[in-house]
């Protein structure tokens, strides 16, 4: 049994987790080790997660997919397996949920702070910028995103959502709706 409990993050140091974390940087090599261990005939992945990073979820999903190609993978869902928790589960051969498991929440979102008003109006900070191209300061918190940048972010989120729904559709053998 491999326990995957907590927020899904890329790195234990990334600051997104509010406690225990499922770090793709740890989980992926662990699953590869289980895949290569001839004494392990199947893997039960116990998932208890509200989700987290879409990127980290994709990395773990790929590792589960590689593992599944060599031996059976069974997901056992705990209290919740939502969003990224479901993402990392959907590639398994079998998924079992408790009657009270909260699961699903198939979607992604992005949240980007704009603290420019706080910095300039409240704190009186001014910013001078020197950049090498028009996207060099993309994502700075010292100004709001412009229309082109917002469209780029929207497209990125939409691509991520389409990938997520395709993973679920393929893994569970159901149509995307």
Protein language model regions, located:
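Small-residue-centered hinge/linker elements
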Residues: 1-72, 80-86, 90-171
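Catalytic machinery of carbohydrate-active enzymes
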Residues: 176
């Amino acid at each position: 049994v491999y326990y995957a409990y907590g927020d899904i993050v890329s790195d234990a140091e990334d600051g997104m987790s509010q406690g225990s974390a499922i770090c793709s940087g740890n989980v992926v090599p662990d699953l590869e080790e289980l895949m290569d261990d001839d004494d392990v005939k199947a893997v039960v992945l116990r998932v208890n997660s509200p989700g987290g990073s879409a990127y980290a979820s994709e990395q773990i999903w790929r590792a589960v997919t590689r593992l599944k190609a060599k031996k059976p993978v069974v997901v056992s869902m705990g209290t919740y397996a939502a969003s990224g928790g479901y993402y990392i589960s959907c590639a398994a051969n079998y998924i079992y949920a408790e009657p009270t498991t909260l699961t699903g929440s198939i979607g992604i979102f992005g949240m980007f702070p704009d603290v420019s008003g706080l910095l300039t109006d409240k704190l009186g900070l001014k910013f001078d910028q020197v950049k090498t191209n028009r996207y060099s300061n993309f994502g700075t918190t010292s100004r709001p995103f412009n229309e082109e940048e917002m469209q780029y972010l929207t497209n990125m989120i939409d691509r991520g959502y389409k990938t997520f729904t395709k993973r679920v559709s393929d893994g569970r053998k159901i149509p995307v709706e």
